[in-house]
Regions:
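Auxiliary, metal-adjacent structural segments of Zn-dependent hydrolase domains
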Residues: 8-64
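Second-shell loop/turn segments in exported
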Residues: 18-27, 71, 123-129
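Soluble non-cytosolic domains of exported or imported proteins
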Residues: 24-31, 79, 83, 128-132, ...
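Short pre-active-site segment immediately N-terminal to the catalytic Zn-binding motif
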Residues: 69-84
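Active-site recognition of the HExxH zinc-binding catalytic motif
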Residues: 81-99
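Post-HEXXH active-site segment of zinc metalloproteases
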Residues: 95-123
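Long, well-structured alpha-helical subdomains associated
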Residues: 119-178
């Protein structure tokens, strides 16, 4: 209170926060992310997605639990759709199931993939082979969803620039799934 946080927050959020929430809801109504997630994963998803708009979350969209994720208040609609397409996929398959275990067994023998796991900048996360598989499969699937919904980034640019280019597996999986 003494630091003036309430006034700072009111100034930072501005008078238009409720308007922004309504704009986001209205803008997203024409994007059926869940339809594509169900189609590509074979899983059922709840029909509702909860987006929590925050002032200080850039540059990330962050899954909290279930189908709730956090994102910056001022992200555009395309970014919001891409975040929803990605975050709700975690994990893309049961990571202790036969498909993931078989993939992990194969990937564990791949020198390039294991070098990426060991040597990439740890600030990007994904410090285990399981983490890389989980993330990169989500990225490949979210790219397909974003393309279907008309909000995709260029995949070559995305994977060359993002996280110092560590998502080689995502690019390969995307190529196989297209």
């Amino acid at each position: 209170r003494d630091a003036g946080f309430a006034a700072f927050r009111a100034e930072r959020a501005g008078p238009d926060l409720n308007t922004r929430v309504a704009d986001v809801q209205r803008s997203l109504s024409s994007f059926d992310v869940i339809l594509w997630q169900e189609k590509l994963t074979g899983r059922k998803f709840d029909p509702a997605i909860e987006i929590v708009l925050l002032q200080f979350s850039k540059p990330h969209g962050i899954k909290v639990q279930g189908q709730t994720f956090l994102q910056a208040t001022d992200y555009d609609v395309a970014t919001t759709v891409r975040i929803a397409a990605h975050e709700m996929l975690h994990p893309p398959v049961p990571m202790d199931g036969p498909v993931a275990l078989a993939a992990l067994k194969v990937l564990d023998r791949e020198d390039l993939i294991m070098r990426i796991v060991r040597e990439h900048d740890p600030r990007w996360g994904y410090t285990t082979l399981e983490g890389v598989l989980n993330e990169d499969l989500c990225e490949a699937l979210d790219q397909l969803i974003s393309e279907a919904l008309g909000v995709a980034r260029n995949p070559a640019d995305r994977w060359r620039k993002q996280d110092d280019g560590m998502h080689v597996l995502a690019a390969g999986l995307y190529g196989l799934l297209r």
